[in-house]
């Protein structure tokens, strides 16, 4: 049986964008730091990493689509944080953001990772942005690196 999997290394020319939803920036800044750390630890060059900032999670799919269409990047890592409040807004934003990123990803030939936290509390978000539960920005970047390399093998 042949096993095909992506490796966790980047060549010196790989260009990756992080698209960051600034809303809840206390959390998302930490996700970006985790993603940058993963990029550099796996062989990426600082000058080949771009950070695209959008106001909130709902804007991620549109920015993702435009970034892909620019043909400047080999892969894209989306990060953000949607934290439940006292209104149904959380449900709409988290669902549409997830669907939007998935739809854009499946309709283009470029690896995309989903590092958008959807949590019930700020404490859960903090845990996933670099404390008890690791850093989901770091994980999203390693995922997109692995998928980029897997794509080359398929």
From Swiss-Prot:
Q: Where does (2S)-2-hydroxy-3-oxobutyl phosphate bind?
A: 86-87, 128
Enzyme Commission identifier(s): 2.5.1.78
Signal peptide start and end residues: none
Q: Which SUPFAM superfamilies match?
A: Lumazine synthase
Biological process, per Gene Ontology = riboflavin biosynthetic process
The residues annotated as the active site are 89
Name the Gene Ontology molecular function terms of this record: 6,7-dimethyl-8-ribityllumazine synthase activity
**InterPro entries assigned:** LS, LS/RS, LS/RS_sf
For this UniProt record, give its keywords in alphabetical order, as a comma-separated list. Answer: Riboflavin biosynthesis, Transferase
The UniProt record gives the binding positions of 5-amino-6-(D-ribitylamino)uracil as 23, 57-59, 81-83, 114
**GO cellular-component terms in the record?**
cytosol; riboflavin synthase complex
Per its database record, what is this protein's job? Catalyzes the formation of 6,7-dimethyl-8-ribityllumazine by condensation of 5-amino-6-(D-ribitylamino)uracil with 3,4-dihydroxy-2-butanone 4-phosphate. This is the penultimate step in the biosynthesis of riboflavin.
Hey, which family's this protein in? Belongs to the DMRL synthase family.
What protein is this chain from? 6,7-dimethyl-8-ribityllumazine synthase
Task: Give the originating organism.
Answer: Campylobacter jejuni subsp. doylei (strain ATCC BAA-1458 / RM4099 / 269.97)
Q: What is the lineage of its organism?
A: Bacteria, Pseudomonadati, Campylobacterota, Epsilonproteobacteria, Campylobacterales
- In the UniProt record, the gene name given for this protein reads ribH
């Amino acid at each position: 049986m042949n096993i095909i999997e992506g490796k966790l290394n980047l060549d010196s020319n790989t260009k990756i964008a992080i698209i960051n939803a600034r809303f809840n920036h206390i959390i998302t800044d930490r996700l970006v730091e985790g993603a940058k750390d993963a990029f550099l630890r796996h062989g990426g060059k600082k000058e080949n990493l771009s950070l695209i900032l959008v106001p909130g999670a709902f804007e991620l799919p549109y920015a993702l689509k435009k970034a892909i269409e620019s043909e400047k990047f080999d892969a894209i890592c989306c990060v953000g944080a949607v934290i439940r409040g006292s209104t149904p807004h959380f449900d709409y934003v988290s669902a549409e953001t997830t669907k939007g990123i998935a739809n854009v990803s499946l309709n283009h030939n470029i690896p995309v990772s989903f590092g958008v936290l959807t949590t019930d509390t700020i404490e859960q978000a903090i845990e996933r942005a670099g404390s008890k539960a690791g850093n989901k920005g770091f994980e999203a970047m390693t995922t997109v690196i692995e998928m980029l390399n897997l794509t080359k093998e398929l």
